[in-house]
Amino acid sequence: MQQTFKHWQIAPDTYAIQCPGYLPGPGRLPGWGYVICYLIVGREKAILLDTGYGNADLKAEVESLTDKPVLCLNSHVHPDHSGGNQQFGTVYILEGERETIAPMYFPQPPERERCDMVRALPDYRFAFLQEGSVLDLGGRSVEVLRLEGHTPGSMVLIDSQTRFLFSGDAILKRVLLMAGQPLSQYRAALERTKAHGGFVDIYGAHWYEPLGADYIDKVLALIDDFSPDRCESAPWMEANNMMMFCHGNAFEEKDFAAIGFGEKDMALMLR
């Protein structure tokens, strides 16, 4: 288990912060792995996207990188992305993420088992952004989009300066569909994001390398090839009866793509 923060600059005034947490296992089906937050710094303020497990002083790490006031956003409110929220007071999420909030307050297994230092009760408040909002950081703007599928109100950000899309868990090499929505709805959300454009690379929360904008096409192709016969048990979440389907043989491969879903949701995958 990684015990300290690690950060690196992915572009001028743009940082990836790898939070303390479980490192991924090798091979085709690594575990949940580390969580990466992103810090986007403008002339007047900064955005922090996600807060990790909450088991270390993320605020101090952020303050070591910028002295600007920080707007804290959650791409979604799963505990590995919102665990450090209490360090920031007010946290912004998409309006569509309201329905995900209630079940996600700490402590929640298996997160409690993974990290025994999380707070039992939140002492922060959520504020809500609308899809299409543009956040002005001073000489740098960040657009807020919705890309539902992993959760009903998953937020992605497009940064005008770098033309990076920060995807949280909405676009990853292995996406878990947990919103209770049809696979076709996730596909439509991907198509909507692709049509919006304005980005050249995708930075997700559980992989340290960027995915090119064309990675969306790889996920769309995977969805179009979906068949129940190609699905298999997802070993990283056997206790939760998760299934998966994928292209590629190893997670580390550039073109690897996988989608996981609950076994009980097979009918949703066919709609």
Give each language-model segment a name.
Residues 143, 170-179:
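Surface-exposed cleft-lining segments at the edges of enzyme active sites
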Residues 131-158:
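Core dinuclear metal-dependent hydrolase active-site scaffold
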Residues 53-136, 173, 224-236:
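Active-site HxH/HxHxD metal-binding segment of metal-dependent hydrolases
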Residues 6, 191-271:
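Accessory terminal helices/loops
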Residues 5-64, 156-172:
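Conserved beta-strand hairpin/beta-sheet module of binuclear metal-dependent hydrolase folds
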Residues 39, 155-170, 185, 190-199, ...:
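Metal-dependent phosphodiesterase/nuclease catalytic metal-binding core
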Residues 28-29, 53, 105, 176-181, ...:
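Short, solvent-exposed loop/turn segments at secondary-structure boundaries
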Residues 48-51, 69-80, 92-96, 146-149, ...:
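Active-site neighborhood of phospho(di)ester-bond hydrolases with catalytic His/Asp-centered motifs
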